[in-house]
Amino acid sequence: MKTVAFTTLGCRVNQYDTDAMKGLFLQNNYEAVDFDEKADIYVINTCSVTNMGEKKSRQLIRKAKRQNEDAYVIVTGCYAQLDPDAIAAIDGVNLVIGTNNRSKIVELVEQLESTERQINAVRDIMKESNFEEMPLFGNESDKARAFMKIQEGCNNYCSFCIIPYTRGKLKSRKIEDIVEEAKRLVDHGFHEIVLTGIHLGNYGVELPGRPTLANVVKALLEIPELYRIRFGSIESVEVSDELVELMATDKRVCPNLHLPLQAGSDHVLTLMRRHYTLQEYKELIAKLRSRIKDLSITTDIIAGFPQETDEDFEETLNTVREIGFTHIHAFPYSIREGTPAATMPNQVPEAVKKTRVALLNGLSQAGYEAYAKSRIGKPGEILIEKEENGYYMGLTNEYVNGKVKSDGAHNIGDLIGGIVVGLEDNYLIIE
């Protein structure tokens, strides 16, 4: 049996794409092995959000060839879509696929085997208008949570972001296809589904009848054995009243939202071409917290955007302190050629970016601890993801790490709960 190994850089959408490609190989009688092992085929799913993502992608390509010089090396994902010629020029790369056409990956490998010539299968993503169905079969992972992509592409064109150029226009998945995959995942033991997409909050705007993310959630709530529905990243301006009502009234819709802030300064938000003001963002947070009990809010913040002054950044720090995020994904601004921000004057020095990220990370940890401690004395429940050192471990509904003493009677994917009695090493202790 031929072996195939996968590695993934970047976001949850990329992880879904990897799992889906893995499923296609498994359906065709390949065996999946760890990327550090010798394999017949290596698949590297790349990222282009930052320069570091591209650097890591190149390193992984070379690592694969060192592990087995006779292996086929397949490079896919955003970096492959953005610069296929650069990928193809790397010694040892056999197949380049972008962010579309991946449903044919096994066929392309078979074509490789018959021709022994490099294949560049990257297509113009801007000409693609339909969602590429590449569903999970349920045997790609042994985890309790499954990521499920329901939307692709983005029309926002923020000044710093390369993703619209690598993922293309908005493309949404039909609700019936989403439900069919969700049922299959539940049948395979996945009791939490994380809905993901590049521009998740804009789900359905281009489909007939304009179905919404709330419509998707309502359809999924009809699946009895689906214990939890969680969302990936959603733009704050796209959180609808209908979605808020679902979160407020059905406990299976997790009280956790990832709402990218990107900057806590209106000056910087304008430069970024974001579609909200700081005041609008704060008002939404207040509204959400008034409606959704125990809501935890996580976010993304870019440090050191061009022209971000010390005063701008101090305003961001004050905003973070005021809102109290449960977690902040803080990262330094990275120049992406072809985006408006790349040519803006007054680029911030790397050392300043690093310092600002460190300050944000400190506030992130403080915010996590504050929220976690607020749970002490209240009910807590985890979906078991692993058993380790005598404890069942997993995430609570609110996206906080939790652990319960093992009794030997539960399995991965089960819900188990009690009362939160403490916090230890970033884990809630539940008894």
Describe the function of each predicted region.
Residues 255, 336-342, 430:
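Conserved loop-to-beta-strand segment in the C-terminal subdomain of adenylate-forming
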Residues 73-74, 82, 87, 187-310, ...:
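Conserved SAM/AdoMet-binding glycine-rich loop
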Residues 343-431:
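Terminal RNA-binding accessory module
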Residues 1-203, 218, 257, 279-290, ...:
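Proteins enriched for Cys/Gly/acidic motifs involved in redox and nucleic-acid/cofactor modification
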Residues 141-144, 154-156, 253, 263, ...:
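Short flexible coil/turn linkers enriched for glycine and charged/polar residues
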Residues 8, 233, 261-263, 384-386, ...:
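Flexible glycine-/small-residue-rich
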